[in-house]
Amino acid sequence: LRQQRYDMVLNLADQWPRAVISKLTGAATRIGFDFPKRRHPVWRYCHTALASTQQHNQLHTVQQNLSILAPLGLQLNDAPARMGYSEADWAASRALLPEDFREHYIVIQPTSRWFFKCWREDRMSALINALSAEGYAVVLTSGPDAREKKMVDTIIAGCPQARLHSLAGQLTLRQLAAVIDHARLFIGVDSVPMHMAAALGTPLVALFGPSKLTFWRPWQAKGEVIWAGDFGPLPDPDAINTNTDERYLDLIPTDAVIARSE
């Protein structure tokens, strides 16, 4: 890193090794955050300036990260997020779609790395059946993880008559971006593809459970966020066992998602 002769380092992390690495780069400007738990001379020594975190508990994660620019006199609280992909990405993903799916389809990503963020499979099946009855084609996506693909298979089994096609585990992130960008609507849970849809400007319906909604809701999204906390009590996000079998999104009624998706 020192050999790259960086002019500036922006350290968004709160870990000690990141601060030390920032110092070791030799960059003339090294900005970090003034985390209360890091108010120590060594933390200050590793950086040339520290940005305030005083308002972070009220800000979206994007705004928190952008606030590191404050020592430079820059205020970019509403900067748009964007995601790109190549024509080759779209060509590759388009070739995987049936001919009659290549326009006006809905993408549904029912999975997340953490299953406590997922909606029950039979409810996803009911949603797909309702959309299919209205004439919509649905593309199902997921990551390559075996558990995610098994979830998708279970959902498909509940939709024997639906106009449905699965690309679960078959796409790179940029190919997935191309598929989402050409969709009429994205429906998904609190996961990376939801944020991709927001960055691509695709209308979305996002299902949220016990995540910190202020921090992690889709940034500047077109569409709606359905929060499980509006339908019943949720645990504190910081107290969740991420390996739990609990499906906290099950508080969200199927009809509420169908109504916002049609």
Kindly label every feature range from the protein language model:
Residues L1-E262:
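Catalytic machinery of carbohydrate-active enzymes
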